[in-house]
Amino acid sequence: DEPDGVPTTQKQ
């Protein structure tokens, strides 16, 4: 998944 701090989409 994406690393925290690099939002690809709005992941809440």
Curated annotation (Swiss-Prot):
Domain of life: Eukaryota
Gene Ontology cellular-component annotations: extracellular space
Free-text tissue specificity from the UniProt record: Hemolymph.
Biological role stated in the UniProt entry: Does not function as a hemocyanin.
Subunit-level organization: Hexamer.
Family named by the database record: Belongs to the tyrosinase family. Hemocyanin subfamily.
Protein name: Pseudohemocyanin
Organism field: Necora puber
Taxonomy of the source species: Eukaryota, Metazoa, Ecdysozoa, Arthropoda, Crustacea
